[in-house]
Amino acid sequence: MLKTTIIGASGYTGAELAFMVNKHPQLTLSGLYVSANSVDAGKTIAQLHGKLANVVDMVVNALTDPKQVAQDSDVVFLATAHEVSHDLAPIFLEAGCQVFDLSGAFRVKSDGFYDTFYGFEHQFNNWLDKAAYGLAEWNQEEIKNAPLVAVAGCYPTASQLAIKPLLVDGLLDTQQWPVINATSGVSGAGRKASMTNSFCEVSLQPYGVFNHRHQPEIAQHLGCDVIFTPHLGNFKRGILATVTMKLAQGVTEQQVAQAFEQAYQGKPAVRLKGDGIPRIQDVENTPFCDIGWKVQGEHIIVISAIDNLLKGASSQAMQCLNIHYGYPELTALL
């Protein structure tokens, strides 16, 4: 049994991870932690997340000595803020822990990226170079071998899963950049209260127009520029991404279908709907990404739907763990 620790356990993604670790036949939950000054320290996770009552009743402790925690852990999930993951990951890695980081701290290898989009200067280029990008369906060999897996972001997961099969097979005219319009539920903003995610203030609206940090993450890992506009929706969880692209000359609907089928054959977390239209309610509280598409002339619209807290975060992190250790991909996820 792998001793598994969750840092940032009080948040939505941390709670989802606690449920999965408890359910996993090869993992044992060795500790739940929050920052030293968190008001949640000392409470049980079931007090913070009622759905875990009589499931996981472990106390959430303040993280005061990460080196000691590392000695008691085989696996560490970091469900923490970007700058916190940046500082903590090397401590656990140097102690020999396998680390799965749900933040953006190790996702993008690009000069100046973290200064520009995350507001801090990256100090650990050696670990940045060693990190595998945790887009589970596309980077399995890297995930199997890396000591650090930087789990893909929520919007980047929904977007890339919709685009990559066509891009890899050379079916797109990339002179016209893919245009991604994606809407996320309010849980994507986290558990901490703010005016932005207040019940009475939430209204469907775009944000981060032309400057959202997920645009360069998507573009770098696709190897293709994109126009990405995120939207905040007035619902709790889920992401729906609608991607408009131009097909290369002469590409047929049959080639499109074949590209998706070949890309995701044997990939149990992706469900292809063909010309059916994905819906958030079909993926909510599941580890799946549903993908559908429509072709008209030289253009294609691909729609993908995920649960932002699961396939966009916690279940993808667990899927990466399963890939890394050779367990069935959906172990503890269904």
UniProtKB/Swiss-Prot annotation:
Alphabetized InterPro entries for the sequence: AGPR_AS, AGPR_type-1, NAD(P)-bd_dom_sf, NAGSA_dehydrogenase, Semialdehyde_DH_NAD-bd
Record keyword Cytoplasm present: yes
Subcellular location per the Swiss-Prot or TrEMBL entry: Cytoplasm
Record GO cellular component, one term: cytoplasm
Reaction(s) catalysed (UniProt annotation): N-acetyl-L-glutamate 5-semialdehyde + phosphate + NADP(+) = N-acetyl-L-glutamyl 5-phosphate + NADPH + H(+)
GO biological process, one term: L-arginine biosynthetic process
UniProt-listed Pfam families: Semialdhyde_dh (PF01118), Semialdhyde_dhC_1 (PF22698)
GO molecular function: N-acetyl-gamma-glutamyl-phosphate reductase activity; NAD binding; NADP+ binding
Sequence intervals crossing the membrane: none
SMART domains: Semialdhyde_dh
Keyword Cytoplasm: yes
Protein name (database record): N-acetyl-gamma-glutamyl-phosphate reductase
Family of this protein: Belongs to the NAGSA dehydrogenase family. Type 1 subfamily.
Protein's job: Catalyzes the NADPH-dependent reduction of N-acetyl-5-glutamyl phosphate to yield N-acetyl-L-glutamate 5-semialdehyde.
